[in-house]
Curated annotation (Swiss-Prot):
Location within or outside the cell: Cytoplasm
One example GO MF annotation: urease activity
Family that this chain belongs to: Belongs to the urease beta subunit family.
Protein name from the UniProt record: Urease subunit beta
Matches recorded under NCBIfam families: PRK13203.1, urease_beta
Assigned keywords, A-Z: Cytoplasm, Hydrolase
Gene (name only): ureB
InterPro entries for the chain: Urease_beta-like (IPR002019), Urease_betasu_sf (IPR036461), Urease_subunit (IPR050069)
Length: 101
């Protein structure tokens, strides 16, 4: 092994294996694109995104870490969400929770 070398496991790595998922339809009602990162509390996204926020409470996008989904103006698309894990406490973002979920 060389310093800094990464040796990946063989086969396919399944993200969020065994986690419950929710699929919702999201529409961007605004006139500007909205981009949402992988670990953003989806419930607290831009108010111009129209979707069932109750289903998104405590959830984040089911995409690889460090990536994002972009919603163009007028665009509708389905996204899959997974629960935030860890302590399940949310602080910051749009300050709509500021505590335990």
């Amino acid at each position: 092994m060389k310093p800094g070398e990464i040796i990946a496991a063989e086969g396919t790595i399944e993200l969020n294996a065994g986690q419950p998922t929710v699929t919702i339809e999201v529409a961007n009602s605004g006139d500007r694109p909205v981009q949402v990162g992988s670990h953003y509390h989806f419930f607290e996204t831009n108010a111009g995104l129209l979707f069932d926020r109750d289903k998104a409470r405590g959830m984040r996008l089911d995409i690889p870490a460090g990536t994002a989904v972009r919603f163009e103006p007028g665009q509708k698309r389905e996204v899959t969400l997974v629960p935030l894990s860890g302590k399940r406490e949310v602080y910051g973002f749009r300050q709509q929770i500021m505590g335990r979920l």
